[in-house]
A protein has these predicted regions:
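Compositionally biased terminal segments of proteins
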Residues: 1-166
Length: 166
């Protein structure tokens, strides 16, 4: 029988399969919904003998998974996740209507009603107002001037657009 915690009370976050130790990822199934295919080859900077087609999570799945795991993350990891969500929204801002369709047509129906409530609640809890996690995210982005208010506004507006009903 598997437990979320080890005998010493610490979270059990790894699993051994043969000689490989891997980190357990929560809500991994969300990352597998409508993955995007990209080709890695010499032409785009990968020193491969043959091109390799890779599947990567679509941006909607990526942000939803970050919202689902937020409460279980350490504070420093939460700040990194906030910055990842911010950067993903900025990078794909022109595609938010298409990303919303992925959410409404594929991701949301695959989640339990409790998970859907967690997503919407986490978006409001994390980005409803500037907080210490958002301030820490701004500090992490030290090489570029990011204001906590700007992070909060971008994430709140972007997630509102992503999660609003079709």
């Amino acid at each position: 029988m598997s437990s979320e915690y080890r005998r010493n009370g610490k979270p059990d976050v790894t699993e051994r399969v043969g000689d490989v130790v891997a980190q357990k990822l929560r809500h991994l199934e969300v990352l597998l919904v409508q993955p995007w295919s990209v080709t890695a080859n010499r032409g785009n900077g990968f020193d491969l003998a043959e091109p390799a087609v890779l599947q990567i999570p679509n941006p909607s799945s990526y942000m939803i998974q970050k919202l689902l795991i937020h409460d279980r993350r350490k504070p420093a990891e939460r700040a990194k996740d906030v910055l990842y969500i911010h950067d993903t929204i900025e990078l794909f801002s022109d595609s938010l209507p298409a990303l919303r369709r992925i959410w409404t047509d594929s991701i949301s129906p695959a989640l339990s009603s409790a998970a859907r409530r967690t997503v919407s609640g986490a978006a409001e809890e994390i980005f409803g107002a500037v907080n210490d996690t958002i301030r820490e995210a701004a500090l992490i982005a030290a090489t570029r001037p990011l204001d906590p208010i700007r992070i909060q506004e971008v994430c709140s507006a972007g997630l509102d657009e992503l999660l609003r009903p079709a």
